[in-house]
Structures are given as C-alpha cells and as structure tokens.
UniProtKB/Swiss-Prot annotation:
Gene: ramA
GO terms, molecular function: DNA binding
Designated name of the protein: HTH-type transcriptional activator RamA
Every HTH luxR-type domain range: 213-278
Role of this protein: RamA is a master regulator of acetate metabolism. It positively controls the expression of acnA, aceA, aceB, ack, pta and ramB genes in the presence of acetate. RamA is also a positive regulator of rpf2 gene expression during growth on glucose as the sole carbon source.
Gene3D superfamilies: 3.30.450.40, Winged helix-like DNA-binding domain superfamily/Winged helix DNA-binding domain
Superkingdom: Bacteria
PROSITE patterns linked to this entry: HTH_LUXR_2 (PS50043)
Phenotype of null mutants: Cells lacking this gene grow on acetate with the same aconitase activity as cells on glucose. This mutant is unable to grow on acetate as the sole carbon and energy source and, in comparison to the wild-type, shows very low specific activities of phosphotransacetylase, acetate kinase, isocitrate lyase, and malate synthase, irrespective of the presence of acetate in the medium. The transcription level of the rpf2 gene is reduced 2.5-fold in the ramA deletion mutant during growth on glucose as the sole carbon source.
C-alpha cells in the first residue's frame, strides 16, 4: 500500500469521525482497519479518555467489531459487558475506557470490508435509531470517499488533488437531501417531453453519482434507476407507478429485474446495493 493511498484514506476516515461526532454529539468515534489476517485494529479515534482502545488489535469474531465483520451488518449494544450477542474477550479494555453503549457499522468497498466505524458513550444509555441511522449514513459516505480515492489512483490522478474531494464528510441529513434531490430530478426528467431537456436533467443526475459507477459492469436501465429512485424516496409500488405514469405490475417487473442484477432480496437491499456501486447517490 503506497504512502499516498494511506494518507488519502486516513484523511477520509478522520473527516468521517469528526463529522460523525459533530452530527450526533456522541463523545467517542473510532475506526478499526481490517488487517491482512482478518483481524481488526483500531487505528483512528476521537474522544477516547484512555489509551486502552488505542491501536487495539481485535481477533476475528471477537466483540462488537468482530461480529460486524462476521455478519457484514451493523451491531449495537446498550451494555457492552453484559450483551449476549457478542463475545467478551475485550471487556477489560472496554471497562478501562469506561464505554457502555456502542454501535458499529461495516465499511465495505467493492464488496470487501475495509473496516468498522464505531460510536460509543461513557454512560449506560441506549443509542437510538437516529444515532444508528447517522452512523450508517456516515459509513456509506466514507465507503464512497474511499472508492473515489481508489478510482482516482487507478486513473493516475496526480498528488495534490485535494480540490477534487470534499474537505469534510457530509452528515446523514445533508447526504439524504442530496439523495432526495437526485430522486426528484429523475422523476422530473421522466415527466419532461422535450428530449434535449430530458437529457440535460439526466446528465445532472449522473453528475450527482460517484465515479465508482463508471467502473461497474452491472448495467441498470434508465427506467430501472427511476424505479429505484422512487423506492429510495419511500414510495410504494403504487405510488411509484403513479409518479412514473406506468402500471404497478410494470414497477414490480422493473424491481425484480433490478434485484436480480444486484443480487438483492428486498427493494431496500436493492437501493443500498445501487448506492454501493454508485448507481444512486
């Protein structure tokens, strides 16, 4: 791994941790990197009171982080040392730091788990759905930033390219506004009869999607993207059909096609999969 890649990725991770702490008010944010032997190591942190967790190495399957890597899903516990969904080899380190509630989310780039994003508090309070959603949104944004770093390197973009990347990671609310705007633009393009204007609107939509999309082999049609954009807004099949001016059965057909292409089992898995490959923001 070259020095420039390490610096670029560390900057993106640091920005994510800072942004997450600001957005949630949670005192502790951490990132654990997946090592070559599938162990985790906490390599960056904000707000730790002691060195107990700093640079801590976590064996596969151990604790919250190990479970996240094993399941590839978010994990949250409100009382770490008593939680029955995780193993407890690292309880002493957690107790030394004084953490109680922890939420951890995987960071996945090109289907490979690159690390785990954590938040934690030093008191016995439950971290609610709003916090979990914010951590998840930040993880998704970090995934895209890491993917952009990788894409820029593959394309030989020279050093000193900071102007091409955001100086900070958007928080969940800001990112959701981008997604909502993208979906509404796609719906507007769908209703426009002027072909030139429609193409202009579709180009605007494309500009809101990360460069990862260019490298993907999975090809989604414009109509399939329209359906996904509706689903991303929370529309039912009937509402999507009304928005697009087509039948509900046609919407279902598009969704089945999308789910098959993306290997998704539900409509919301399809939306998340599309975001991972850069087909949706």
């Amino acid at each position: 791994m070259d020095t420039q890649r390490i610096k670029d990725d560390e900057d993106a991770i640091r920005s994510a941790l800072t942004s997450l702490k600001t957005a949630t008010g949670i005192p502790v944010t951490m990132f654990a990197t997946v090592l070559q032997d599938n162990r985790l190591q906490i390599t960056q942190w904000v707000g730790l009171r002691t060195p107990a967790l700093q640079n801590l190495v976590i064996e596969p399957g151990v604790g919250v982080g190990g479970r996240v890597v094993a399941t590839r899903r978010p994990v949250g516990v409100s009382d770490y040392t008593r939680a029955n969904v995780i193993s407890h080899e690292k309880d002493s380190a957690i107790q030394d730091e004084g953490l109680h509630s922890i939420v951890a989310v995987p960071v996945i780039v090109h289907r490979e788990i690159r690390g785990v994003l954590y938040v934690g508090v030093h008191s016995a309070v439950r971290l609610g759905d709003t916090v979990i959603e914010e951590v998840t949104m930040t993880a998704r944004t970090l995934e895209q930033n890491l993917a952009i770093n990788s894409a820029l390197r593959r394309n030989g973009v020279p050093d000193g390219r900071g102007s091409l990347k955001a100086n900070r990671v958007m928080n969940g609310a800001e990112w959701e506004q981008v997604r909502s705007t993208h979906s509404k633009l796609r719906m507007l393009a769908n209703r426009v009869t002027d072909e030139d204007l429609r193409r202009d609107l579709e180009e605007l939509c494309d500009q809101m999607v990360t460069p990862v999309r260019i490298k993907q082999t999975t090809k989604l049609s414009a109509r399939e993207l329209d359906v996904l954009a509706c689903v991303a807004l929370g529309h039912t099949n009937v509402e999507a059909a009304e928005e697009m001016g087509i039948g509900a059965e046609t919407v279902k057909s598009y969704l089945r096609s999308v789910m098959r292409k993306l290997g998704a089992h539900t409509r919301y898995e399809a939306v998340n999969a599309a975001r991972r490959i850069g087909a949706l923001p």
